[in-house]
From Swiss-Prot:
Record function comment: Attaches a formyl group to the free amino group of methionyl-tRNA(fMet). The formyl group appears to play a dual role in the initiator identity of N-formylmethionyl-tRNA by promoting its recognition by IF2 and preventing the misappropriation of this tRNA by the elongation apparatus.
Gene3D superfamilies: Formyl transferase, C-terminal domain (3.10.25.10), Formyl transferase, N-terminal domain (3.40.50.170)
Encoding gene per record: fmt
Record-linked NCBIfam families: fmt
Disulfide bonds: none
GO cellular component entries: cytosol
InterPro entries: Fmt, Formyl_trans_C, Formyl_trans_C_sf, Formyl_transf_N, Formyl_transf_N_sf, Formyl_transferase-like_C_sf, GART_AS, Met-tRNA-FMT_C
Protein name: Methionyl-tRNA formyltransferase
EC number: 2.1.2.9
Length: 314
């Protein structure tokens, strides 16, 4: 089976590795162009590019996949299937119709829930207890094609988006191989999605991580877990931005304003929320490394009564 693989971030590495390991004929890899990153703005390769080069695969990094010259290249490769995993560009109808077996996508949710760019993060932020991966035939819509295989997992109570991503990446790689084997044998029939059950997982931005202390402790803790490792949940302490890496919930209701520091112990910083108390266990001030509260308090102080999220703390 001649495969063209299209993918870009870390999540797309394991499926490509699995294709190579299972001796699929990967005739070309398409990934996003190198982008400037970091303070020095040096061009950085995508994780998929690095794997493709390590295995000597033919590599393409078109700025626009829809350009006629790129479409002609894809046609000339005569793919049996195009596999797409978090590529970052939309495939035109013309491209979708090129492969013999169509274009197959690995999506990190139980479709039709959480269509879109950030299904892993949004599932945790929304407090979902389970998620998974879905393989599907691609059509011109956004994650709207007929579903092929679904694999479900439970989301751990303390699991972060980064940890869940790693689990779903491995599950996606395994599910992709099973999907391709069944598609090639003709034993797999696509199932249409129910649009009435669909939801959309919008792309993340830095502002998403700002904590609203009027929300419940549970909602804030879900935000913290769902934004690790990026964009990170944050608040301010006396005007200084603080990222929060770890927290737990205390159910006891006490008086105070949302965002108010109720008490400070080595085990954590107790903060009043709209419902319940959030205990912050690991923090990171701007320009500093993450520290457990116990470590931070060894050389610093946190004042009781300060309102988090207020520029002056009052």
């Amino acid at each position: 089976m001649r495969v063209i693989y299209m993918g870009t971030p870390e999540f797309a590495v394991a499926p490509l590795h699995s294709l190579i390991g299972n001796q699929y004929d990967v005739v070309a890899v398409f990934t996003q162009p190198d982008r400037p990153k970091g303070r020095g703005k040096k061009l950085q390769s995508t994780p998929v590019k690095e794997l493709a080069l390590a295995h000597g695969l033919m590599l393409y990094q078109p700025i626009k996949l829809r350009e006629s010259s790129v479409v002609e290249i894809i046609k000339s490769l005569e793919p049996d299937v195009i596999v797409v995993v978090a590529y970052g560009q939309i495939l035109s109808k013309e491209i979708l119709e090129i492969p013999t077996y169509g274009c197959i996508n690995v999506h990190a949710s139980l479709l039709p829930k959480y269509r879109g760019a950030a299904p892993i993060h949004r599932a945790i932020i929304d407090g979902e207890k389970k998620t998974g991966v879905t393989t599907m035939y691609m059509d011109v819509g956004l994650d709207t094609g007929d579903m092929l295989l679904k694999k479900e997992v439970l989301i751990g109570a303390d699991e972060t988006a980064g940890e869940l991503r790693d689990r779903l990446m491995a599950l996606g790689a395994d599910t992709l191989i099973k999907t391709l084997n069944q598609v090639q044998r003709g034993t797999l029939v696509g199932e249409k999605q129910n649009d009435l059950e669909s939801s959309y997982a919008a792309m993340l931005d830095k502002g998403l991580g700002q904590i609203n202390w009027n929300q419940s402790a549970e909602a804030i803790r879900n935000l913290i877990r769902g934004t690790i490792p990026w964009p990170m949940a944050y608040t301010t302490y006396l005007g200084n931005r603080v990222k929060i890496w770890k927290s737990r919930i205390e159910e006891s209701e006490v008086s105070g304003k949302p965002g108010e520091i109720l008490k400070v112990e080595k085990s954590g910083i107790f903060v009043k929320t709209g419902q319940g108390t959030l205990v912050i266990e690991r923090i990171q001030f701007s320009g500093k490394k993450p520290l457990d509260v116990r470590e931070y308090l060894a050389g610093n102080t946190i004042e009781k009564g300060v309102l988090l999220g207020e520029e002056d703390g009052n």
